[in-house]
Amino acid sequence: MAVKEKKEENKVFISEADQYLFAQGTHYDIYKKLGAHPSVENGKEGMFFGVWAPNAASVHVIGSFNGWDESASPMEKLGPGGIHAVFIPGVSTGEMYKFLITTPSGEKLYKADPFANYAEMRPGTASRTADITSFKWTDEVWMKEREGKDHNKEPLAIYECHIGSWMRHPRPEEQGFYNYREFADRIVEYLKEMKYTHIELMGIAEYPYDGSWGYQVTGYYAPTSRYGEPQDFMYLVNKLHKNKIGVILDWVPAHFATDAHGLGRFDGECIFEDPDPRKGEHPDWGTKIFNYGKTEVKNFLIANALFWIKEYHIDGIRVDAVASMLYLDYGKQDGQWVANKYGGNKNLEAIEFFKHLNSVVLGTYPGFLTIAEESTAWPKVTGKVEDDGLGFSFKWNMGWMHDFCEYMKLDPYFRKDNHYAMTFAMSYNDSENYILPLSHDEVVHLKCSMVNKMPGYQVDKYANLRCGYTYMFGHAGKKLLFMGQDFAQEREWSEERELDWFLLGEDLNKGMHEYVKELLKLYRKYPCLYEIDNSWDGFEWLNCDDKDRSTYSFLRKASNGKNNLLFVINMTPIKWENYKLGVPARKKYKLLLSSTEERFGGCGAEIPKEIQAKKGTCDYRNYHITLDLPPYAAAVFVF
């Protein structure tokens, strides 16, 4: 495809100032200089190529436009910083290319472009030239409104999704994949119907191995070609925005793939990773670790985050494997890691990288989200950088997720002995801004799907899960559900097949789908469920100590004191008659939602539609309500 729009002539495409800023680690638009860019030189249209390869003896561009001739297109080394560049006339978009890097010893390396905007469909490994500047965005209203959002006081209900296995294409020639545009037309209606606020997309940056789910990246600046071209991905984001749905990307700065065409030993030396394998390799994952102390590497990563924001209008990044970056000994045995200059196990360069990243990104783009998947008790992950925090917007509450799953899979007989696993998270809830995640990691590798973690017969499993989801949506913290879990997918997730959509024809699954939809509607309708998430001002236990009956009851409170909600949940198969519960006010408590309704797959046991509180001490309060609490029942009242 020919370059359609006329390009301005650019005699000095990469200036000395560009080279200086990149060497300093602060050229946040470096992706506009390195890589492949349509340009004009001496009146001729073509493509400008730039690459950082400081140790190379020579670099050539080889591609479909020059017959992969290894001598046809030599690049010029511009200065001591190691950037090589060349303008090649007549090259249009859609062409395949690689950099042929020759080392001082004569070794030849055939590398994909680290800044490529498009890649050859796997198993091919070439980069492709692309035009990412001519797409006509129509999401101005969304982008303007985003600037004014304080997400701590807004509902955040995230649908974690893997495009390739959400729904498979029936035509064999498509390799099972829907195009980004086809996916957009399907997913938007689903998300709107269910009332999710955001979608979190796995595996968008280009990667070679399907089984890595996108967590072993080779092309940080290229949306994967499995689902189409760059402008197809822009269409997806634009359509989601037009329908008031935010887009979060899984972002993987923790490590990268070792494939020969990737970043490893890029110019014959370790320029992206540390040359010491104790610092530059992940033994458990078989991947390379970025060298966060190197200015050009930090620049590559921070500019990458900004690239997705500016060029693709992304609304947030979920940073994968943060703990593996913070600790030098993460996943390593004695002798496999090197201590920092103080003799400790903290990765000082990675800490500084996160502070730099969040300061630049959140300081430049108000309303953007940076989310840390951090699995330890590292302090101040969402603390302000000026207070020595890492500066993230939110942190996944992995502790809550672990405790929740461990408790819910217990036989009810043993739950009383583990009662406080479900209440523990509130003891540290105000330490960070949390998201409660039930992610893909919990439904793979023989962990079972969410519904099959539950004990009992099939109807018991579904009743348990409805109770669990009610607890999750009532608990302080933003929400994340992995695809399929909102209709109780029964098989574990696999990237090789689509979700079992046929289950929506089954009463229990259809009921679960409707129930999660009601929870999402409730969550978005009532400010008490989201506007005060990290303070006791928004949450109050009514009874967190009823371990003998395995019940939990609590309030969610709004800042204006209106339309507060009361949650009561019975985690046993026993009906508790004349269940008395202390309440804060002598009011009428009106039922909003009951998990036992038949339309949700429940047993049909009725919970009173309205209960008048009476005077009388209970749970250290002056008023109480009384009801019969059915087995495996969750109820939500408004007052």
Listing of model-derived features with the role each one plays in the protein:
Residues 52-59, 584-586:
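Short proline/glycine-enriched turn/loop motifs at strand-loop junctions of beta-rich domains
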Residues 1-48, 76-160, 165-173, 182, ...:
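The feature marks proteins involved in alpha-glucan
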Residues 93-97, 608-639:
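C-terminal beta-strand-rich structural cap/linker in extracellular carbohydrate-active enzymes
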